[in-house]
From Swiss-Prot:
This is Methylthioribose-1-phosphate isomerase. Its EC number is 5.3.1.23. GO terms for molecular function: S-methyl-5-thioribose-1-phosphate isomerase activity. The keyword Isomerase applies. It catalyses: 5-(methylsulfanyl)-alpha-D-ribose 1-phosphate = 5-(methylsulfanyl)-D-ribulose 1-phosphate. Transmembrane segments: none annotated. It comes from Heliobacterium modesticaldum (strain ATCC 51547 / Ice1).
Length: 345
């Protein structure tokens, strides 16, 4: 099961809106199709969005059939701008686009064909590096997982949310591979049920014991002493350690704090936005109100009832026990340790 796969001249993208019942791939022949897929959550998860966006730039480059370098550059930069408008919160998107644009600037004197080849190679590198970072994160996170641990996770931060292996689920996978007898509670994650549809499915595919719960049950299973730690992913982390992640994460963190349970965030360095001082500066995406009025095709609320549907919330740094990254585990004080992390090679 691949989240995405480059095939010669186009991108195959697993349609996550069809999971867990149907495994169907979308053929992306241009960046416009990819923009639509990102907006509609057919691909989601900050690292996966970043990798997909890099391939979107490669598609735009490949679709140019002329030889005028200025025209080529304009086409690619338009694609970068279009991709940057798809989702505002996940910082990996902008990190990947800046990386692709930097390559474009470096090679602007090359022939169009050479530029196309370099941009495709860079997109593949973004993808491959993300997978490697996730594997590394899993190894660093192993030390934090006790034997026979009960682990609660929210949303989906697995292979589906990345280029492969996963961030939060990558740590869980690493613990499972190491022979630790762990079990997982997966919040269903309303309104789009990423925990129920994706996390539960991923863990079952890997033979990792998982129990699905509604979001409102999280505090109760903690009180019942069924949870030893919480581990989640992230869409953006600021310089002070504030964390934007799927809506509901903040509530889980508060419950973990109240019950004395460690709350860990697993994320690659590309998810850290040290240009922002705190979570107050993170733009929070608001999505279609129908996502809340419906579950799938079923209407579950009175037609026309007002809805508030932020896709993310911000968990304050003081609720985060530690960050698990591809460069190690970082603990408070985050203003110091996260800057040290950024300087680590």
């Amino acid at each position: 099961m691949d989240t995405m796969r480059w095939q010669d001249d186009h991108l195959l993208l697993l349609d996550q809106t069809k999971l867990p019942l149907t495994e169907e791939y979308i053929e992306c022949w241009d960046h416009v199709i990819l923009c639509d897929a990102i907006k509609k959550l057919k691909v989601r998860g900050a690292p996966a969005i970043g990798a997909a966006a890099a391939f979107g730039v490669a598609l735009a480059a490949l679709n140019y059939t002329g030889e005028d370098r200025a025209e080529f550059e304009a086409d690619v930069k338009k694609a970068i701008a279009d991709l940057g408008k798809t989702r505002p919160t996940a910082v990996n998107l902008f990190w990947a686009l800046r990386r692709m644009e930097a390559v474009l600037e470096d090679i602007r004197t090359y022939s169009v064909k050479e530029q196309q080849e370099r941009l495709i190679a860079e997109a593949k590198a973004v993808f491959d590096e993300d997978r490697a970072m996730n594997e590394q994160m899993g190894q660093y996170g192993l030390e934090l997982i006790p034997e026979s641990a009960g682990i609660l996770t929210h949303c989906n931060a697995g292979a589906l949310a990345t280029a492969g292996f996963g961030t939060a689920l990558g740590v869980i996978r690493a613990a499972h591979r190491a022979g630790k007898e762990i079990s997982v509670f997966a919040d269903e994650t309303r309104p789009l049920l990423q925990g129920a549809r994706l996390t539960a499915w991923e863990l079952m595919q890997d033979g990792i014991p998982v129990t699905l719960i509604t979001d409102s049950m999280a505090a109760y299973v903690m009180k019942q002493k069924l949870v030893d730690l919480v581990i989640v992913g992230a869409d953006r982390i600021t310089a002070n350690g504030d964390v934007a992640n799927k809506i509901g994460t903040y509530g889980v963190a508060l419950a973990a704090k109240a019950h004395g349970i460690p709350f860990y965030v697993a994320a690659p360095v590309s998810t850290f936005d040290l240009s922002l001082e705190s979570g107050l500066q993170i733009p929070i995406e608001e999505r279609d109100t129908e996502e809340v009025r419906r579950v799938g095709d079923s209407i579950t609320a009175p037609p026309g009832v007002p809805v508030y549907n932020p896709a993310f919330d911000v968990t304050p740094a003081e609720l985060v026990t530690a960050f698990i990254t591809d460069r190690g585990v970082f603990r408070p004080p985050y203003l110091e340790t996260l800057r040290a992390m950024a300087e680590t090679k």
